[in-house]
Regions:
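Residues forming the flavin
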Residues: 2-51, 55-525
Length: 525
């Protein structure tokens, strides 16, 4: 197979134009078929927006070697398709392996074990995605929180109520990244995620994909249980022998993949009490900022935003503040919503969420600043958790149980907003005016304020006074890391930490890939 990179075409090109470019690159050598492997928008020249393609081309028998011998184009090369293959099980298990958690890491770990014929028991503290959706909608409308069924807990994990981004910086020579995307497509995700430079599913489509994976696990003999919270771990002589479910039932097992998500603070506490080795780690905290989608689109695409049918524009911004903190955009949601993502009573955190069409009036992103264990009160494993809880409590209090919102102008002046400008919030969850400076450490507030000013040099209008701020974004990643060895096992034999909650991933795809890796370790001698 031959790959042709850097095929550039106008945004409004027809399919025939791509085929013509392929023929030209091949000097009219006959080819059987082509497959788009990557497509991105080049918006560096706003007056000349273009798509840039990479395609894989299959030539006729004997033609590939002949063509490559004569080829002098550095954008054309031979490639071999990487097809990930999960190994056959090599171990004997007295009891079925258990997967704790049904976010991307747990789902893919369970899927791999099920496809290997191991009939895993899959435990999720929250509800299935359909009933979870009802609880979340009720919370957004009424403010009544179900601590076990919310934006953080339930089938699909926190990513179910997000933008559904699938890009990752994790490199994997074995093809796990592609495998994850292909699995999503098998279960109903749009095929474009296989080649778009910044693939995303959207929360509306992701829910059905997650349910489809669950049903495959069940069809292969997996035992999937909802509202099954792991409340304790039975450990004898440094080895796991069982799990306690809902403080009642004991499930015997010698192998449990632990994928609880980054908000399973009660689980972290139990594990700490059981002497599982874990350490606090750096993360980031901040606010969600909202701008008009049209403003962001015009900034990124120029006049092309009006001329062409383009996806809602995204951005990625970074800044190093004078106080030494890194400030950056995180989990940018084009055409999306700011959602109340709380999971604990009297504590409040937010996140961003988009549907597949990304058609909402505002585009939002977290603007966050780094915090390290030096910022925490104490140096034990749960110090970062307590840090999050402290500021989430302040946010809950400031908003009187609702999402506290403020204009950028008033944030800088430290006063409560009385009325909005042209921009109004686009949220899922009730809102209230509040002073967000009371909800963040002062060095973080200062770094964010400074960063917003700098970001205006990259995106005109980013620093406008009526920019909406919503707070706080406290769950950007896990506040701790559960240590594991080269075999992916913790210091307690039989417990295999996994995914974002354990500190080994950031986002849907990397968490899913980590779930596959850990499942692979489990079945390999």
């Amino acid at each position: 197979m031959i790959r042709i990179n850097q095929i550039k075409l106008p945004i409004d090109h027809k399919e025939a134009a791509l085929e013509k470019k392929i023929k030209k690159a091949l000097h009219n050598t006959e080819y059987k078929q082509y497959k788009i492997v990557k497509r991105s928008i080049d918006a560096r020249k706003k007056e000349e927006l273009s798509y840039v393609y990479a395609v894989d081309v299959t030539l006729g028998k004997g033609q590939e070697e002949k063509f490559l011998k004569k080829n002098k184009n550095r954008n054309i090369m031979a490639v071999k398709e990487k097809k990930f293959e999960f190994p056959e099980n090599q171990r004997e298990f007295k009891y079925p392996p258990v997967v704790n958690g049904m976010g991307p890491a747990g789902l893919f770990a369970a899927l791999m074990l099920a496809r290997d014929g191991l009939h895993p028991i899959v435990l999720e503290r929250g509800k299935d995605v359909t009933n979870r959706m009802k609880d979340v909608e009720h919370f957004w409308e009424s403010g009544e929180l179900n601590p076990e069924s919310n934006v953080q807990f339930g089938e699909g994990g926190a990513g179910t109520f997000s933008d559904g981004k699938l890009n990752t910086l994790v490199k994997d020579k074995f093809g796990r990244n592609r495998f994850v995307l292909e699995t999503f497509v098998e279960h109903g995700a749009p095929e474009e995620i296989l080649y778009e430079n910044k693939p995303h599913i959207g929360t509306d489509l992701l829910r059905n994909v997650v349910a489809g994976i669950r049903e495959e696990i069940r069809s292969l003999g997996g035992d999937v249980r909802f509202e099954a919270k792991v409340t304790d771990f039975v450990i004898q002589d440094g080895k796991l022998t069982g799990l306690i479910i809902n403080d009642k039932e004991e499930i015997k097992t010698e192998a449990a993949i632990l994928a609880p998500g980054h908000s399973a603070r009660d689980t972290f506490k139990v594990l700490s009490d059981r002497d599982l080795e874990m350490n606090p780690k750096a993360f980031a905290i901040g606010l969600r900022v909202e701008h008009p989608r049209e403003m962001i689109d015009h900034s990124q695409y120029g006049k092309g935003a009006d001329q062409y049918d383009l996806p809602a524009a995204s951005y990625k911004l970074t800044y190093h503040a004078n106080n030494g903190r890194s400030v950056y955009s995180f989990c940018m949601c084009p055409g999306g919503f700011v959602v109340n993502a709380s999971s604990e009573p009297e504590r409040l955190t937010v996140n961003g969420m988009s549907n597949h069409d990304r058609a909402a009036k505002n585009s939002n992103s977290a603007i966050i600043a780094s915090v390290t264990p030096e910022d925490f009160d104490g140096n034990d494993a749960l110090a970062g958790v307590r840090f999050q809880q402290k500021w989430e409590e302040k946010a809950f209090s400031e908003g009187k149980g609702r999402i506290p919102v403020q204009t950028l102008k008033d944030f800088r002046e430290g006063k409560i907003t009385e009325s909005f400008g042209e921009i109004t919030p686009n949220t899922k969850g009730l809102t209230s005016f509040g002073n967000l400076r009371n909800c963040l450490p002062e060095p973080v507030s200062e770094a964010i304020s400074e960063g917003m000013e700098y970001f205006d040099t990259k995106i005109k209008g980013f620093n406008r006074e009526d920019t909406i701020l919503c707070g706080i974004e406290a769950r950007t990643s896990s506040p701790l890391r559960i240590e594991r060895d080269q075999g992916f096992e913790s210091n307690i034999k039989g417990i295999y930490p996994c995914g974002e909650g354990a500190g080994f991933a950031g986002g849907i795809t990397s968490a899913a890939m980590d779930g596959i890796k850990v499942a692979q370790a489990l079945v390999t001698v």
